[in-house]
């Protein structure tokens, strides 16, 4: 979800469209040599590539979260990272109908062949937990 600290949104009207989002400071993920583009999906309008000129670029999601919490701009964050801050009203969801594309969680292991039962159970548990988290947080998307 796209999120911002309330202080960021107190200085001007909350954006109602992607065009209005250009009036706000944004936080990018990656490096300065890359173009900053958010891939956002809207149920009725489909997918768009929102190109922006970030005021800050960091190279990991924890850095993005910290920058947003400290009021440095608007950024997309995985709901599993932002939901506690949203519940406490420390972050506000911006343009909730526009959702960033889903991320992927990777688990690295040598091979499925000969996979230890404990590792198989761990992978099954993680899949179950992420699926449940998705269901629990559906209202924030």
Mark where each language-model region is:
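C-terminal effector-binding regulatory domain of bacterial HTH transcription factors
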Residues: 79-88, 98-141
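A ligand-binding cleft/hinge motif common to bilobed small-molecule-binding domains
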Residues: 65-90
């Amino acid at each position: 979800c796209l999120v911002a600290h309330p202080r960021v949104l107190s200085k001007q009207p909350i954006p109602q469209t992607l065009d209005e989002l250009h009036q706000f400071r944004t936080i990018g993920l990656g490096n300065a040599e890359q173009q900053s583009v958010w891939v956002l999906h809207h149920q009725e309008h489909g997918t768009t590539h929102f190109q922006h000129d970030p005021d800050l670029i960091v190279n990991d999601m924890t850095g993005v979260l910290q920058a947003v919490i400290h009021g440095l701009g608007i950024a997309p964050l995985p709901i599993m990272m932002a939901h506690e801050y949203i519940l406490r009203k420390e972050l506000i969801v911006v343009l909730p109908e526009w959702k960033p594309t889903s991320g992927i969680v990777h688990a690295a292991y040598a091979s499925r062949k000969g996979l230890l039962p404990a590792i198989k159970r761990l992978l099954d548990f993680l899949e179950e937990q992420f699926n449940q988290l998705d269901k629990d947080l559906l209202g924030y998307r």
